[in-house]
């Protein structure tokens, strides 16, 4: 029986991927449909994906599948055929092809069974995730943006919204989707008569969010088909104005796709215009934050002087410090407003 989990170190896998000569295509897709046995489905897909040298991150649950993957260019057609024939529910599934892709988004295949394919915190047994809002395509999105009766709601996290969003879109300030859902209902109560347009990166979050809004009494609810990725692709193909401003954050090694040339965010350390996310190089931190090239050199890729100093210590001393640190200090904290001021990052006023 083949091994159904990776057993090679991350460093070795990344080096192997970077040495590849064949171009790769970054693809994302999702589908809400009933999977009776997620573990068996997971194992079968793992074998299929491994045979095609697919890398990436795949989640399965009884409610469906959510995947962000990298496929060798020569295998894309075969991958599509095998995925479509794997289950009738996946036939002709929309595949979101990355917009700004160097083919180096993933270097290992990780496939996990979870309670939900996107953590939503919903416990209401009467909630019907299939009762979603109306889909909007690119031209319709642009028309809605010009409709004074429409409100665009960004269902992504704070750090995603910070580097790019649709014109005049409302942010639901939170670091997780499960935090956003109740906040969205609360914030939109005074706008129940408006047209609510929800969007996210690839469609999976805004689709479920649209169903949640309808479950909570909102009647005029839309969401963008395929999310930002599909909107930008179709708008460009059809010669339409692209009304998304800035960069689309993505959850892989690239950390972003350039949609427009606008830079709407700022370096979290010095305040200069910048929209490049990075993870703090200190292994005891790994905070996700925005850092300009000047600060990257000044702080050696770290988020603070404290982390810069710590990352320069001998490995044994770094491990000792990490072992003695409270778990609270290890939280992957993503909001700029909580940028570990105790670690030497001053609060930034922009």
Curated annotation (Swiss-Prot):
PROSITE patterns listed in its UniProt record:
RHODANESE_3
Q: Which reaction does it catalyse?
A: uridine(34) in tRNA + AH2 + O2 = 5-hydroxyuridine(34) in tRNA + A + H2O
- Enzyme Commission number, as recorded: 1.14.-.-
Extract the GO molecular function terms from the UniProt entry: oxidoreductase activity, acting on paired donors, with incorporation or reduction of molecular oxygen
Under the heading Pfam families, the entry gives:
Rhodanese (PF00581), Rhodanese_C (PF12368), UPF0176_N (PF17773)
User: What processes in GO biological process is this protein linked to?
Assistant: tRNA modification
Q: Which UniProt keywords apply?
A: Oxidoreductase, tRNA processing
Region forming the signal peptide:
none
Identify the catalytic residues: 200 (cysteine persulfide intermediate)
> What InterPro entries is this protein classified in?
Rhodanese-like_dom, Rhodanese-like_dom_sf, Rhodanese_C, TrhO, TRHO_N
User: Where in the numbering of this chain does the Rhodanese domain appear?
Assistant: 146-240
What does the function comment of this entry state? Catalyzes oxygen-dependent 5-hydroxyuridine (ho5U) modification at position 34 in tRNAs.
Q: Fetch the NCBIfam families from UniProt.
A: PRK00142.1-1
Q: Which family does it belong to?
A: Belongs to the TrhO family.
**Could you identify this protein by its name?**
tRNA uridine(34) hydroxylase
The organism is: Escherichia fergusonii (strain ATCC 35469 / DSM 13698 / CCUG 18766 / IAM 14443 / JCM 21226 / LMG 7866 / NBRC 102419 / NCTC 12128 / CDC 0568-73)
Question: Which classification does the entry list for the species?
Answer: Bacteria, Pseudomonadati, Pseudomonadota, Gammaproteobacteria, Enterobacterales
């Amino acid at each position: 029986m083949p091994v159904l989990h990776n057993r090679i170190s991350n460093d070795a896998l990344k080096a192997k991927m970077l040495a590849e000569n064949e171009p790769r295509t970054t693809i994302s897709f999702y589908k809400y449909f009933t999977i009776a046995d997620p573990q068996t489905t997971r194992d079968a897909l793992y074998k299929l994906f491994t045979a095609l040298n697919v890398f990436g991150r795949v989640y399965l649950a009884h409610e469906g599948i959510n995947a962000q993957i990298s496929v060798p260019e020569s295998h894309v057609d075969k991958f599509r055929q095998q995925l479509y024939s794997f289950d009738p529910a996946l036939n002709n599934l929309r595949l979101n092809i990355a917009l700004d892709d160097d083919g180096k988004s993933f270097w290992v295949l990780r496939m996990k069974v979870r309670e939900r394919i996107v953590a939503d915190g919903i416990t209401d047994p009467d909630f019907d995730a299939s009762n979603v809002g109306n889909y909007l395509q690119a031209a319709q999105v642009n028309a809605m943006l010009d409709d004074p009766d429409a409100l665009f709601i960004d269902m992504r996290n704070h750090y995603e919204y910070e580097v790019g969003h649709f014109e005049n879109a409302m942010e639901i300030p939170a670091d997780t989707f499960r935090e956003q859902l109740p906040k969205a209902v609360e914030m939109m109560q005074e706008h129940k008569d408006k047209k609510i347009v929800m969007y996210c990166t690839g469609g999976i979050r805004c689709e479920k969010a649209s169903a949640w809004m309808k479950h909570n009494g909102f009647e005029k609810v839309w969401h963008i088909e395929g999310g930002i990725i599909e909107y930008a692709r179709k708008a460009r193909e059809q010669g339409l104005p692209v009304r998304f401003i800035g960069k689309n954050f993505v959850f892989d090694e690239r950390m972003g796709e350039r949609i427009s040339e606008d830079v709407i965010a700022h370096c979290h350390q010095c305040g200069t215009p910048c929209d490049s996310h990075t993870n703090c190089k200190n292994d005891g931190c790994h905070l996700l934050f925005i850092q300009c090239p000047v600060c990257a050199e000044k702080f050696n890729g770290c988020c603070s002087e404290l982390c810069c100093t710590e990352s320069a210590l001998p490995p044994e001393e770094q491990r000792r410090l990490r072992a003695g640190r409270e778990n609270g200090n290890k939280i992957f904290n993503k909001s700029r407003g909580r940028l570990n001021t105790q670690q030497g990052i001053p609060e930034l006023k922009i």
